[in-house]
Design a protein with these regions (language model features):
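Active-site helix-to-loop segments that bind/position phosphate- or nucleotide-bearing substrates
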Residues: 7-127
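Flexible, glycine/charged-enriched surface loops at secondary-structure junctions
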Residues: 60-68, 147-162
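Short, well-ordered, mixed-charge alpha-helical segments that flank or form enzyme active sites
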Residues: 111-113, 137, 167-170
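A broad, structural surface signal
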Residues: 48, 52, 56, 139, ...
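Compact, glycine/acidic-enriched structural inserts
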Residues: 124-147
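Short, Lys/Arg-enriched N-terminal segments with co-localized hydrophobic residues
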Residues: 1-6
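Short terminal or interdomain "cap/linker" segment that borders an active site or interface and mediates
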Residues: 107, 155-203
C-alpha cells in the first residue's frame, strides 16, 4: 500500500520490455520440479533457447490503479468501495493501509501462441518447460510493475497478494476486475474466474 493521498497519476498502463524482466533461472528450475537442484545441461540449454525465442515474441504488459481503502476487520478489506474477503492471513498485512494499488500483469497473447505451436507439434517436454518459464515471466512482470510504482510513489508498501493464494478465494477475481478497465492489458476473465492469457497475474 501507499500512504500518501496526493498523487499525480491514478492509473498507469505500461508495456514492459522483455529485457527489463529479471528472469531467475533457479525459479524456472523450481517450477520444473528441481527444487534447489540444477537440471541436466540439455534442459538448461532448452530453457535458454526458449527464453531467447520468447524474448523476440512476448509483449509483456502491466497496469495498476490506485484506490483509497481500509481494513474492515480481521478478514476483510474495502478497496474503492468494494469489499473483499481476503482472509485472516492477508488482512493483517494491510493494517493502517490507506491506499491500495490494484494491478494486472501478463506475459501476453504471444506467449499463448508460442505454447499452442508447441502443443501442435506434440512436444510435451517443451510444453512443460514453457509453462514453467511462463509462470516466472508473469511473476517477473509483477516485480517490474512494482519497481515502476515505487519510482512514481516512493513510499512503504506490502508484498503483492492475489486471489487464489493465502486463503483469498479465486472467485473474488471478478470483484477485483471491477476496479480495472475492461480487458486490462488484453486480459479477460472467464466465468470460472481464470485469466486469459493464461500467464497473467492480478492482485
Amino acid at each position: 500500500y501507499w500512504g500518501d493521498k496526493t498523487m499525480a497519476e491514478k492509473e498507469i498502463h505500461t508495456r514492459i520490455p522483455f529485457c527489463d524482466l529479471q528472469i531467475d533461472r533457479q525459479e524456472i528450475y523450481r517450477a520444473m520440479g528441481y527444487r534447489e537442484e540444477v537440471p541436466e545441461i540439455q534442459f538448461r540449454e532448452m530453457v535458454e533457447t526458449m527464453l531467447e525465442e520468447l524474448a523476440g515474441l512476448c509483449r509483456p504488459q502491466g497496469l495498476y490503479r490506485i484506490y483509497d481503502g481500509q481494513v474492515v476487520d480481521s478478514g476483510h478489506i474495502e478497496v474503492g468501495q468494494i469489499s473483499f474477503r481476503v482472509g485472516k492471513i492477508i488482512a493483517p498485512c494491510f493494517d493502517k493501509a490507506e491506499q491500495f494499488a490494484v494491478f494486472v500483469t501478463t506475459a501476453g497473447q504471444e506467449y499463448d501462441g508460442y505454447v499452442k505451436e508447441l502443443k501442435a507439434k506434440e512436444d510435451m517436454v517443451s510444453v512443460f518447460m514453457a509453462d514453467a518459464i511462463g509462470s516466472v515471466i508473469a511473476e517477473a512482470c509483477v516485480t517490474e510493475v512494482i519497481k515502476r510504482l515505487e519510482k512514481q510513489i516512493p513510499l512503504r508498501h506490502t508484498y503483492p497478494y492475489s486471489p487464489g493464494y493465502c486463503g483469498w478465494n479465486v472467485k473474488e477475481q471478478a470483484a477485483l476486475f471491477q476496479l480495472l478497465p475492461e480487458n486490462p492489458c488484453g486480459v479477460k476473465l472467464t466465468d470460472s474466474c481464470l485469466m486469459l492469457p493464461v500467464k497473467s497475474v492480478s492482485g
